[in-house]
Regions:
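Glycine-/small-residue-enriched transmembrane alpha-helix faces in small-molecule transporters
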Residues: 1-35, 84, 142-169, 188, ...
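Helix-helix packing/entry segments at the starts of transmembrane helices
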Residues: 8-10, 35, 97-104, 166-186, ...
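Hydrophobic/small/kink-forming positions within alpha-helical transmembrane segments
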Residues: 14, 18, 45, 75-79, ...
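Specific transmembrane alpha-helical segments of multi-pass solute transporters/efflux pumps
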Residues: 16-17, 45-98, 134, 214-232
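Specific alpha-helical transmembrane segments that line the substrate/conduction pathway
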Residues: 31-42, 82-119, 156, 234-253
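Hydrophobic transmembrane alpha-helices of multi-pass small-molecule transport proteins
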Residues: 44, 103-104, 120-139, 156, ...
Length: 291
């Protein structure tokens, strides 16, 4: 499972931006977020109940300090990150470009973790960043960069980076953490939806988007992310985010026919090389944040 987890995570997570773009044709941002969070919460509560019934000894109640940390991570990942992520795509910015912005996470994570980074690792991180810059430059003639979209994308980047780093310091079972975070996020997002007056057109297409984002991404991919972060550390996992733009561009092209320039493909290839070699030189143990 540990070897398969990164590939499953990349496939599910990278499809998210395109599925959000698809679903937002039938729903407002906050209605989509609220519905997604509600379905995810129900799934996680059911999974937690089944798991705790079969293996009660493996799930222990968190301390007050641990619970506060879990809820802070939930606010960052389930509320802030997803809200900014959806808002960025709603501005019309390409899903591929949103994921390119999020691809900067591996550069931020080692510094937030106060981690020793070797010259070789730093060179590979900078190589990955160069690949992202090349890809964005290649896409600038194809897709107009919406200013608000970029701002929301950067806000999403910092939200998921801080959330992932803090998640690495949580020792509670990943299923318990995910359930608590979802229980926190759902009433917040539903409350915002009521205040702004969102709407949904219930079509088969929207239901497919909702199920994929609720079950596939928000439950499946999030549990995989938490599992990998706990096993490998935040810095090692964050480098996977370099690969997400490549797959996101592919999904965007397959579903919406979005064109990809040769320069963007070259940038993607550079990013892929950086990932392959970085994974061969694992980082030193992360110094946990918020001890």
């Amino acid at each position: 499972m540990n070897k398969l987890a990164p590939f499953l995570f990349l496939f599910i997570w990278s499809s998210g931006a395109v599925v959000v773009k698809f679903g937002l044709q039938y729903a407002s941002v906050w209605s989509f977020l609220a519905a997604r969070s509600l379905v995810s919460m129900c799934c996680l509560i059911m999974l937690f109940w089944l798991y705790s019934y079969r293996k009660p000894s493996l799930i222990r109640s968190p301390s007050k300090t641990e619970l506060r940390r879990i809820l802070v991570v939930g606010a960052l990942l389930q509320v802030c990150y997803l809200s900014f992520y959806f808002l960025a795509i709603d501005t019309g910015i390409s899903p591929g470009l949103v994921t390119l912005i999020l691809g900067l996470q591996p550069l931020l994570t080692p510094f937030l973790c106060k981690q020793q980074v070797s010259r070789r690792q730093l060179a590979l991180l900078l190589l990955g960043f160069l690949g992202l810059v090349i890809s964005i430059y290649g896409a600038k003639d194809i897709t107009q960069l919406a200013a608000y979209g970029v701002v929301f994308g950067i806000a999403a980047l910092f939200s998921i980076t801080f959330g992932t780093v803090l998640q690495a310091s949580i020792v509670s079972h990943v299923l318990l953490s995910a359930m608590c975070q979802s229980v926190l996020a759902t009433p917040i997002l539903m409350g915002i939806n009521v205040l702004v007056g969102g709407s949904i057109i219930w079509t088969p297409e929207f239901l497919i988007s909702l199920v994929w984002m609720s079950v596939g991404v928000s439950v499946g991919a999030l549990l995989l992310l938490m599992h990998m972060t706990k096993q490998d550390g935040a810095s090692s996992v964050s480098v996977l985010f370099y690969a997400i733009p490549l797959l996101a561009y592919f999904f965007d092209y397959a579903l919406f026919g979005t064109q990809i320039s040769l320069l963007t493909i070259v940038g993607m290839f550079v990013v892929a090389l950086a990932i392959v070699f970085y994974r061969r030189f694992p980082a030193e143990k992360v110094q946990r944040l918020a001890r």
